[in-house]
Curated annotation (Swiss-Prot):
Mn(2+) 4 binds at residues 823, 825. NCBIfam families: CPSaseII_lrg, PRK05294.1, PRK12815.1. Its cofactor is Mg(2+); Mn(2+). Mg(2+) 2 binds at residues 294, 296. It comes from Methanoregula boonei (strain DSM 21154 / JCM 14090 / 6A8). Residues 1-397 are annotated as: Carboxyphosphate synthetic domain. It catalyses: hydrogencarbonate + L-glutamine + 2 ATP + H2O = carbamoyl phosphate + L-glutamate + 2 ADP + phosphate + 2 H(+). InterPro entries: ATP-grasp, ATP_grasp_subdomain_1, CarbamoylP_synth_lsu, CarbamoylP_synth_lsu_oligo, CarbamoylP_synth_lsu_oligo_sf, CbamoylP_synth_lsu-like_ATP-bd, CbamoylP_synth_lsu_CPSase_dom, MGS-like_dom. The keyword Amino-acid biosynthesis applies. This is Carbamoyl phosphate synthase large chain. The lineage of its organism: Archaea, Methanobacteriati, Methanobacteriota, Stenosarchaea group, Methanomicrobia. Pfam families: CPSase_L_D2 (PF02786), CPSase_L_D3 (PF02787), MGS (PF02142). SMART domains: CPSase_L_D3, MGS.
Length: 1053
């Protein structure tokens, strides 16, 4: 049937901030859906709270609302915009939950739910309804019982037994779920699961741990035509969330009759659900038998992987199906000549490996279960499974420990952590047999054989190998440097022997039809499919897997750079290995390389064609770290390709503390007393000279990794043992810590002669909390015109002094009206998307044009003057990571960001808090606990909260000095003083907000239980007095006036 004529305007709900379980894949799918709908002449209204997304760009939708994703707010937008339909399946779990809530509150009268019908949401997400549907259609499910209260636990154990799996309804990434092996463990998981579930429901399910886990991505249209887009198989068995698993596509270990049985079951289920669009179905499989585990009646993380693995644009097709088009009416935009009803065929093997945040969270529980903990993932493509495994291993940018202790290896293999995939290789190196490893892990022997092949070849290479072994190593995906290290030969010698790789095309049809959107991977089989031409080309280095410190913001910058260069007629190629992102969409760039982001791989790509230049400054710290070695490698090979924009030497000046200090001295710009040290003794001497407390950090890292404020020599010595390991080739940087200073971030573009300031952001938290974790505001709220003028002057001096061409981010601190420079980063920063959305200045696009020679004076942009207030707030991952210190400090911990925008600071901050799942209460009890050094500062905040009608509670010391100041507060016992205490009040829902500001390590330990409980019971919490002051302003504002609901374009006009 042709597209529906009654659907003229569609509301699309985004997924909100990046978080564990819901990352960039929904920006990728949402952006694709927006473009797909607009191609059909549909007016698109988009709601999302995340400014760091491509989908919230002005050209992606007709009306864009950057607002909290709350049903009551979206209901008002629906009332205002009056859409004909709502597309919920592109916004992940958030989108489905909101659609269900909107329907239940009656806000969707006259608005049709497109693609995924409401009943399919209920049957897919409500565990009891899903189980009943599967039983009704004769599809086997694990034995299970639905719980709504803790009192049903014993009944569940009697019927299901232990261990048992807990699956909460309507949650994301398995949040609140897990595997209970004892009654106590099961009770704890169920209590958490019930609190996290939208409908207060969990399913207790018999364990099928150790079975194979299989996934099918299915597409269905309104005429009941179904296709399997991709089949996927988890290397890790059941018991580990698929988002935490190493995944292989296509399925390799089923016989054809078994595969056809599973294919038929997947199609049977999507038909029963009546989903029109995409659907992800997960199965457990063992010895010819299977169980249906769950269904995602929406685009998911697995959908993004399936889309990138096959080249099939799932979200684009699903959006068109939602407005009535049939699969055979939709053109496959990759081939340009086949219909979307053709099932994709692939002649290569794809491997996905997750990226975990444990390099940031040393104390976190690293055990992998049915609840997600990873922040991102990499994807690798090869012609053999060995090759894909090795390319994926090289793509994960984590320091991997080698395990040699047999007992330690057994423990990791049997109780899996994030180290298990790498530990499989260690086990074979230490002489474990295949049967032993299979017994410990329940991993299919087929996968273990491939890993054993790799390790056996490593041993041959190290023992004195033949040239044939080296050729085999290349077919297995070894890098030249890895072969050189094993054989003792030089990397150049290896390269001369093996030559260059071939580049093959991903085309959805195993080369049966020509592809019109080139998308390549390297391999050692056959001839290259790249056709060289004379066009001017630029390669942009992407940002790799999403991790804390390097998130979706850098992909945003990459995509903007591509758009800018294409506007100037330049052919743009991207190299990246992240399957979740817009930059790796099939039509973002002129040519896409899905490859590891390492020097050898990037150099190989540059040798495939005549490249004019490479851009490194949009891909975050990893790409910037490649600048100097890549420049050297290009010169060594005599290649004409240049590093475009700011020179690698200027980047080095900014990173090298001594060189940067010389520059600041020359420019007569103050900075905190600072130095650098290469040893513990030198660090001790320099810190004592500067004076404690000092801020210490390694150089050349992103996200404040291993950064800490240390107060004495003992803390410094403890720190140095970690920091020196993190930064083996660069010094540790030591800065005087400015207490109670206001921190600023400035994003600017420089063309070498002029500087355009994109935005000056004032941090709401004090200096010393990582800028990536601090809420910030545009325009500044507390700085004098004289200070702002100094900030502008210093920004211009530093940008020109460094010789910046492109973007620069400068961090400053203001104390006693003196502006100090903390650091400068001549590259894209994580605040670029926020600045662009808040001001309307597309600074990443401007920077890309400047990098190819355009002048700011010719581009016609000026610093924005805005009437509104925009607040960036962060989302913290503590609800997904047990054992993590919840106190903010100089090391970054947040996974994503949101934006609040209004005409008043208090209202904008209130919106930002709602969006960050930290909704401030307008009534109820507030628990306040601050250290004695902050008692004078907390009194006016406490007084304002009391005057606003909130009731204050605190422990003895805090209550005493509040009473002395005439502020009424109620005493509550400390945890160690027995019950009833603050934890009891939290458990019973009697506390609505926590203000808790520990300063030293001892008070951190004392307050850890309170903050952990706040996370578990979803009570908003504040850990700095600056944020508490802003919260009081926000509560005051929201009590006085209503929030504004306007499209972004109205604020920026």
């Amino acid at each position: 049937m042709p597209k529906r004529t009654d659907i003229k305007k569609v509301l699309l709900i985004g997924s909100g901030p990046i978080q564990i379980g819901q990352a960039a894949e929904f920006d990728f799918s949402g952006s694709q859906a927006c473009r797909s709908l607009k191609e059909e002449g549909i007016e698109v209204v988009l709601v999302n709270s995340n400014p760091a997304t491509i989908m919230t760009d002005p050209d992606m939708a007709d009306q864009i609302y950057i607002e909290p994703l709350r049903a009551n707010i979206i209901a008002k937008i629906i009332e205002k915009e009056r859409p004909d339909g709502i597309l919920s399946g592109m916004g992940g779990q958030t989108g489905l939950n909101l659609t269900a809530e909107l329907a239940e509150m009656g806000a969707l009268k006259g608005v049709e739910i497109l693609g995924t019908p409401l009943e399919a949401i209920y049957k897919g997400e409500d565990r009891e309804k899903f189980r009943d549907l599967m039983n009704e259609i004769g599809e086997p499910v694990p034995k299970s019982i639905v719980l709504n209260t803790l009192s049903q636990i014993d009944d569940a154990i009697a019927k299901i037994g232990l261990p048992a799996v807990v699956r909460p309804a309507y949650t994301l990434g398995g949040a609140g779920g897990g595997i209970g092996r004892t009654r106590e463990e099961l009770t704890r998981i169920v209590e958490l699961g019930l609190s996290r579930s939208r409908i207060h429901q969990v399913l207790i399910e018999e364990s099928v741990m150790g079975w194979k886990e299989l996934e099918f991505e299915v597409m269905r249209d309104s005429t009941d035509t179904c296709i399997i887009v991709c089949s996927m198989e988890n290397v890790d068995p059941m018991g580990i969330h698929t988002g935490e698993s190493v995944v292989v596509a296509p399925i390799l270990t089923l016989r054809d009759d078994e595969f056809q049985m599973m294919r038929s079951a997947a199609i049977h289920i999507i038909r029963a659900l009546d989903v029109q669009g995409g659907c992800n179905i997960q199965f457990a499989f063992k010895d010819g038998d299977y169980r249906v585990i769950e269904v995602n009646p929406r685009v998911s993380r697995s959908s993004a992987l399936a889309s990138k693995a096959t080249g099939y644009p799932i979200a684009r097709v699903a959006a068109k199906i939602a407005i009535g088009l049939r699969l055979d009416e939709i053109k496959n935009s990759v081939t340009g000549c086949t219909a979307a009803s053709f099932e994709p065929t692939i002649d290569y093997i794809v491997v996905k490996v997750p990226r975990w945040p444990f390099d940031k969270f040393k104390g976190a529980d690293r055990t992998l279960t049915t609840s997600m903990k990873s922040t991102g993932e990499v994807m690798a493509i090869g012609r053999t499974l060995e090759e894909s495994f090795m390319k994926a291993k090289r793509s994960i940018d984590t320091d991997v420990r080698t395990h040699t202790s047999p007992s330690e290896i057994r423990m990791i293999l049997s109780r899996p952590t994030d180290e298990r995939f790498h530990c499989l290789f260690d086990a074979f190196r230490q002489g474990f047999t295949l049967d032993e490893i299979a017994g410990l892990t329940s991993i299919v022997p087929f996968f273990l054989e491939k890993i054993k092949n790799i390790v056996d070849l490593e041993k041959r290479l190290a023992a004195g190998c033949t040239d044939e072994d080296i050729f085999l190593a290349k077919r297995y995906g070894f890098a030249n440097t890895e072969i050189a290290a094993l054989t003792g030969r030089g990397a150049d010698t290896i390269e001369a022997l093996v030559g260059a790789p071939a580049y093959k095309m991903v085309d959805t049809c195993a080369a049966e039809f020509p592809a019109s959107t080139p998308y390549f991977y390297s391999t050692r089989e056959g001839t290259s499919e790249i056709v060289r031409d004379k066009k001017q080309k630029i390669l942009i280095l992407g940002s790799g897997p999403i991790r804390i410190g390097q998130g979706i913001e850098f992909d945003y910058c990459t995509v903007h750079a591509v758009k800018a260069l294409r506007e100037e007629g330049v052919e743009v190629h991207i190299v990246n290995n992240n399957p979740e992102t817009v930059s790796t969409d099939f039509d973002t760039s002129d040519r896409l390389f899905f490859e590891p982001m390492l020097l050898e791989d990037v150099t190989n790509i540059l040798m495939t064609d005549e490249y004019y230049g490479v851009m490194v400054q949009f891909g975050g710290q990893n790409a910037v770290n490649l600048a100097v070695p890549l420049e050297k490698e290009l010169k060594r090979r005599g290649m004409c390709t240049r590093i475009l924009g700011t020179s690698p030497d200027a980047m080095d000046i900014a990173e090298d503390r001594d060189r940067f200090s010389v520059l600041l001295t020359t420019l007569q710009i103050p900075s905190p007393a600072n130095s650098s040290a290469y040893s513990e003794a030198e660090a001790r001497e320099k810190a004592e000279r500067i004076g404690y407390p000092v801020l210490v950090r390694p150089s050349y890292v992103l996200g404040g990794r291993a950064m800490e404020i240390v107060h004495n020599t003992a803390e410094l010595e403890t720190y140095m043992k970690e920091a020196v390991r993190v930064s083996q080739h660069h010094p540790v940087l030591i800065d005087s810590y400015l207490r109670n200073a206001i921190e600023l971030d400035v994003d600017a573009v420089c063309d070498g002669k002029e500087v355009l300031i994109g935005g000056i952001m004032e941090h709401i938290e004090q200096a010393g909390i990582h800028s990536g974790d601090s809420a910030c505001v545009i325009p500044t709220q507390s700085l004098s015109p004289e200070v702002i003028a100094t900030v502008r002057e210093y920004t211009k001096k530093i940008a020109l002094g460094l010789g910046v061409v492109g973007l620069v981010n400068i961090q400053m601190a203001v104390k006693d009206n003196v502006v100090y420079i903390l650091e400068a980063n001549p590259r894209a920063s994580r605040t670029v998307p926020f600045v662009s959305k808040a001001t309307g200045l597309p600074i990443a696009k401007i920077a890309a044009k400047v990098m190819i020679g355009k002048k700011l004076c010719d581009l016609g942009f000026h610093e924005a003057k805005i009437r509104h207030v925009a607040v960036k707030e962060v989302l913290l991952p503590f609800n997904k990571l047990a054992g993590v210190d919840t106190i903010l400090g100089p090391e970054m911990k947040s996974t994503g960001e949101v934006m609040g925008i209004d005409y008043d600071f208090g209202l904008a901050f209130y919106k930002a808090c709602i969006s960050a799942d930290n909704e401030l209460p307008l009534k109820g009890n507030v628990f306040v606990s601050v250290n004695i050094g902050q008692k004078d500062e907390v009194i006016p905040i406490a007084r304002r909260l009391r005057d606003l009608g909130l009731t204050l509670y605190g422990t003895e010391g805090t209550v005493d000095y509040l009473h002395e100041a005439g502020v009424e507060a109620h005493l509550v016992r400390k945890v160690q003083e027995g019950s009833p205490n603050v934890l009891d009040m939290m458990h019973h829902g009697e506390i609505r907000l926590i203000i808790n500001t520990p300063q030293d390590r001892q008070s951190r330990q004392d307050h850890y239980q309170i903050m952990r409980a706040a996370v578990d019971f979803q009570i908003p919490y504040i850990t700095t007095l600056q944020a508490a002051r802003a919260a009081a302003l926000a509560i005051d504002a929201i009590k006085r006036e209503k929030i504004t609901l306007e499209p972004l374009s109205h604020y920026l006009r």
